[in-house]
Amino acid sequence: MAAPRWIGPLLLLLLHFVAAVAGKSYYDVLQVPKGASEDQIKRSYRKLALKYHPDKNPNNEEANKRFAEINNAYEILTDQEKRKIYDRYGEEGLKQFQAQGGRGGGGGMNIQDIFSSFFGGGGGGMEEEEEQIIKGDDVIVELDASLEDLYMGGSLKVWREKNVIKPAPGKRRCNCRNEVYHRQIGPGMYQQMTEQVCDQCANVKYVREGDFLTVDIEKGMQDGQEVSFFEEGEPKIDGEPGDLKFRIRTAPHERFRREGNDLHTTVTISLLQALVGFEKTIKHLDNHMVEIGTKGITKPKEVRKFKGEGMPLYQSNKKGDLYVTFEVLFPKTLTDDQKSKLKSILT
């Protein structure tokens, strides 16, 4: 069977990301902690791969890049030898290992192998199967992101404390097995019942642990969008932990106000500038200068639009607009001579 048409371009992207992923660690890319188990890595990979798969994001270059990053990170972190080298020596150590002919330096798992193990068909179809798994509660945290990070992209270090399940002395009753029995509810009538009877499982307890998480802020993210860390939520005995979700909220800014993909700001000019025109620039969020001057008259509260100077659209090369409201600063007093000159000019 022929390979899907997106495989070729994607392999080129994978080569680009083989050593490093835009400064992010492979654990950050897969949104898992450094000590994540292989099962946790696989589950996180599966969810992210489904989200950013090219079939679901046609003609979306940013999503294709993310998909390539995810596959490369998965290939490294599920190879025990590569993962040990990466954990100990970082990306440079991994480069040297592969350059010296280490296992997987040129071969190893390719993208079709990865998808065969998850979705079947050598990386083709995207038949999403939801697993029925008992999970703990998700934890949702409101995270204030600066306009600068939302404009240029950035990351935040966040301290996170959570409950972790640890072994404890003794045994406990659990849900690992049930016993079926029949109860008589009337003459010749019986009802099948189940009862939890296991008291052989080791006891557990909750312990609070903390660690720093790196939350990646992507350009153009909107209020309410979430950055998820799989299985970093509340734990579940005999199940899997829920997810930790950071819900993005735009932090107030001293100069700009965001409305969707547009930016708004207010600039004060003098009465003279309002009447005769002026030259003026303002500094944008990434420090580039925007020329907002005019040769004409500017009315109080006048709003001018500067196309393409707003916020970047999420996973797009386009940008919104910048709206500048002009406040005119009037003099508090005028001398009789000034009044006379103004009358002669304006009448």
From Swiss-Prot:
Q: Name one GO biological process term.
A: protein refolding
> What start and end residues bound the annotated signal peptide?
1-23
* Stored InterPro entries: DnaJ-B11-like, DnaJ_C, DnaJ_domain, DnaJ_domain_CS, HSP40/DnaJ_pept-bd, J_dom_sf
Q: Does the keyword Metal-binding apply?
A: no
The induction field says: By dithiothreitol- and tunicamycin-induced endoplasmic reticulum (ER) stress response.
**One MF term from GO for this chain?**
protein-folding chaperone binding
Q: Which PROSITE patterns match?
A: DNAJ_1, DNAJ_2
Localization annotation: Endoplasmic reticulum
State the Pfam families in the record: DnaJ (PF00226), DnaJ_C (PF01556)
SUPFAM superfamilies associated with the record: Chaperone J-domain (SSF46565), HSP40/DnaJ peptide-binding domain (SSF49493)
Q: Name one GO cellular component term.
A: endoplasmic reticulum lumen
Residue intervals of the J domain: 25-90
**What are the record keywords, sorted?**
Chaperone, Endoplasmic reticulum, Signal
Q: Which residues form a coiled coil?
A: none
Q: Which CDD domains match?
A: DnaJ, DnaJ_C
Location (main, coarse):
endoplasmic reticulum
Subunit structure of this chain's protein: Interacts with BIP1.
Q: Which PANTHER family match?
A: DNAJ HOMOLOG SUBFAMILY B MEMBER 11
Its function? May play a role in protein folding in the endoplasmic reticulum.
Listed name of the protein: DnaJ protein ERDJ3B
Instruction: Please give the organism.
Output: Oryza sativa subsp. japonica (Rice)
